[in-house]
Amino acid sequence: MIANILTIAGSDSGGGAGIQADLKAISATGGYGLSVITALTAQNTVGVDAIYPVAIDFLKAQLESVSRDIRIDAIKVGMLGTPDVTVAVADFLSGFDGPIVVDPVMVAKSGDRLLHADAVAALRDALLPCATLVTPNLPEAADLLGTSEASSKESMTEHAKQVVALG
């Protein structure tokens, strides 16, 4: 049986991240990709030119539509953007019983901020407790923990333990 994997993330017009990259990865590993878009971005390999978050009602409509009709075996969460989107996704995830991978996307590789600073608390407090696996990079882990970035193997290990304790 093919696994149905739902990705909840932003759309990257450059195709190198977000929904587009997730769907490619899901397909390449033999899964069937489903998607719910949290934001539209105008970006390329150089940077992010604009971000347009989807309306909460439309986000909820996407979640309801896909989950009503298709079995979801696992969920991957990426860019959420705003506190409202983060809380709405967390509410949806609280009713899901399968594996949930959360990539707490906060900053693009170009350095552009993708998660509002006021959404970090919602991500940490509402979303991470739903996660089976969280995949922060060093700056994201520091942001989630409200501390400086880990710079040694020991501090990285400590940050990892603290992130695990969040959920």
Task: Mark where each language-model region is.
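Conserved N-terminal subdomain of the carbohydrate kinase-like
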Residues: 2-7, 23-109, 114
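Short, glycine-rich nucleotide/cofactor-binding loops
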Residues: 9-15
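Active-site glycine-centered loops adjacent to acidic/histidine catalytic or metal-binding residues
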Residues: 10, 103, 137
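Loop/helix-junction capping segments adjacent to catalytic residues or to phosphate/diphosphate-binding pockets
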Residues: 16, 83, 153
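Conserved phosphate/ATP/ADP-binding segment of small-molecule kinases
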Residues: 117-167
